[in-house]
Amino acid sequence: MVGGRAPKSPQGQRPSGLNRAAASLGIVAGVVFVAAMIFFSGWTRGILSGGHNHTGPATTGPGGMMGPGRKMGPGQTPPSAFVAVSVATVWTTPQSPRPVDRPALTNPVDIRGWLSDMTPAQQQALTSDNLNQTQALFGDRVFVVGEQGDWDEVVVPGQPTPKDSRGYPGWIPKAQLTTEPAYGALKEHAPFALADRGITTWLYRESGLSDQDLEISTNTRLPVLSRTDKAVQVATPDRGPKWLDARTVAVYEKPTDIPHPTGADLVRYAAVFVNVPYLWGGRAGFGFDCSGFTSAIYQVHGITLPRDADAQAADSQGRPVDKSALQPGDLLFYSHGSKDSDNPDAIYHVAMYSGNGEMIEAFDSTTPVRITAVRLDTDYWGARRYLDQPR
């Protein structure tokens, strides 16, 4: 994506958007926001000792956030937690992970090690045994709706699904989540830096960008604290203020400020991920599944689609497109069953049309992200367009 960056602030000054954000809040929210800024400013100066939990679970006292074994009742507002690892896999149940999955359960997490440790059969079992559901990125908010032992049952907002109106459901180890009201206030109200310039980028411990702290995925969004000409200082859930290379992110005051893309914009960015590994449930630059890939590419460009392929096909944002009229950025769907374009229930795969009779896709556990010829075989279900002006 080209452009869309907020004007740079003089070195050492906060971007004016922070002041506007505070001014636009109500009294109570404004107090929380200012307190959050003081909290993180103090952390930057080193006047805070302790108080943050880098590796611990998201708890507020004995028994965790909700007490041992409790679930949310009808009408209750679930408490928030924040992802404290570069990418947290959302599992189907606490019993789903196998011994080979341990690198994906720790803090810090080792997604690349996990992928390299799995045999092809173990990769395929993630799909066939329905072991995992999706992923959430560093700093993302999740809602905790229950818990079991060392696990929190969550829903992930920003990943729409018919399964739950609040977000995508599943389970995350408590060790990968944290709570921090100051961070939550900034997440809600401050301008944010969006990682949108490559597969992954790094957080740094200082503005000189020489001391790497944590590798994070494309589509990660973190609240902005300040800027220099070369770096953006951001708040993190449990690591204190960190810095991002300004060349790898765009800064926006609110999500609706992200420029609306063309189909060519989507395809250019999708092509960056060619040869990234396939990972069932993957939705990060470390590995994608088919619908995690398409939904992430669109979301980086300010458009939120449902998480799963069948729900993407059914989404009201999409308009049917004849195969003779495909444009870059259109999504192509494949089904083992009915080819009725009004019935997406049997859809098993989605790809993005990239032009010239080709598409880009995260196909299966033996195939990394690739550009290949469009398949218009018996499994082709139809296409949907989500842009008003796809070119």
Name each model-derived stretch:
Residues P277-G292, A296-P328:
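Catalytic cysteine-centered active-site loop
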Residues M1-N19:
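N-terminal Lys/Arg-rich, disordered targeting/topogenic segments
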Residues D140, T220, G329-D330:
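Structural motif
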Residues I38-H52:
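Hydrophobic single-pass membrane-insertion segments
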